[in-house]
Amino acid sequence: AHVLKPGEYEWLQRFSTVDPSALNPLVRNNLPEWLWDAFGKYPGEETREELAKSLMHPALLDLRANTMKTNREDLLAQMNALGGRYQAIPTPYAPDGVRIMGKPALQNTVGFKAGMFEVQDEGSQLLAYLLAPKRGEMVVDFCAGAGGKTLAIGALMRSTGRLYAFDTSERRLANLKPRQARSGLSNVHPVWIDSENDAKIKRLAGK
């Protein structure tokens, strides 16, 4: 165990009496000046403080229920059945989202292997809903990467139509293939492109 030196003990004593509200906001929120200034573009000083404080907390663990195979209610029950220190609750905004309180080894669960859910933050889930894709449409996801949002869009399309997943990284697209296989979606078509001017994109013009 580390034994405090006299100088360290005195510093801790002084630190414990500091009023955080009296500190410079850059120090209080552990932010560089440029980022603090950028947060100032949003209305209200309280909003800026909330944004800054949120960066000091670990990211939340959110799941998206794959509605081709299950629903949120069943996924909640499945996750809560894991027991231990974990608790599953609905995400506040995304209708198919489940928030996990804790860090379980999800890759080892039956639900993950069966493609019943994807690890996906609530914001990304909401983007798919904002797009509002319809059954039978043709949709292109540029910069699809490993395909998290692509798979969310594909599920909303109920595996109909054609959903192209474009990306300039073959490595990232390769990560989409096992995820697509687990999801059960047949309307997703990963396509490598070399740029936004790739001939593969131009062939879709007017369709």
Residue ranges and their predicted role:
Residues 1-105:
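Class I Rossmann-like S-adenosyl-L-methionine
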Residues 73-207:
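Rossmann-like S-adenosyl-L-methionine
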